[in-house]
Amino acid sequence: MPTAPATVRRHDIDALRGLAVLLMVMVHVAATAPPPSIGSTSALGYLVAGLGGLAAPLFVVLAGWGAAGKPRSWRSRCARAGLLLAAQVLVNLCAPHLYGPFTPGVLSLFALLALIPWTHPSQAVQRGVRATAAILPAVVLVAPALQGPSTWDGRVLVENPQDLLGHLLLTGLYPFVPWCGLAWLGVMVRTHGAAIRQAGIVWSLCGVVVCGLLLFRAAEQGVPWAAPTSPNGQAFLTFFPANAPFLLAASTGVLLLWTTGAWLARAPGLPALGRLSLTVYVAHTPLLWLLHRTVEAPSAILSAGLVIALTFVWWPIAAFWPESVRTWTFEAALSKV
């Protein structure tokens, strides 16, 4: 969502941002108004969750890609982080059925990432920062219990400063660890590009194979293959917290989507949507609260209609957004600091 500081915008990157926000809105609407007749472990449920589950990882990789541009001053990084934290509080207040006022979320993760000097005049500092971001996700392998419980309530409740700090760094919805690893991936894609193409192909092949094997094993054992949360620990892939299989699947999915950037850039209006992705993310949140209050146990047809309408309505809105009011967006505010 945070835009790259480059002077010339790349349409493929903007198109990927546009795709990411469409996927994010889609999965949020689908989760808010799910039809009782379609279970989360059905083929359709896995398809929607799988595509929607790539939204946040794609955004984080794009954030890393953007951060790998020109170095920013400490003052600029703090100002951007402050704006993103304010946007997070606004999102929380617009969706009280999901979050507390100070629940850390994806925008607070972007705020933390904005504070990190991914590019720095000192090569020693730059290498140290990037190496640390690459190593920290190993926590999910070495000590997965540190990530906290796989329950929604346990990851959104903030009762004191200790809860806030813990959720920001490790136990929340989108904690810095291990999500910083996906930001590091974005940095690597921008700084090394074609040089890591072969490594990316190998990683993606491994990811596809491992995910396929886990899917087969889940079907064999009669347990969920993937789930947002898994209080009983049965699901192989969990989003909250982001466990190792999920991180492998997410990075694989993002790398595969990345290869479609040039093709997506040709979609009319999609890059324009990407340039308003943060604004759209914030603006769609009140609709989730409205859906929660007004729609209960919808039919499959109604649910599908709501998902399609409330997802794709943002595409023409962004495409025809007047230039005269483009300054009244979160992206414009970020570009000024």
Walk through the language-model features, giving the residues of each.
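Alpha-helical transmembrane segments and their immediate juxtamembrane cytosolic regions
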Residues: 1-337
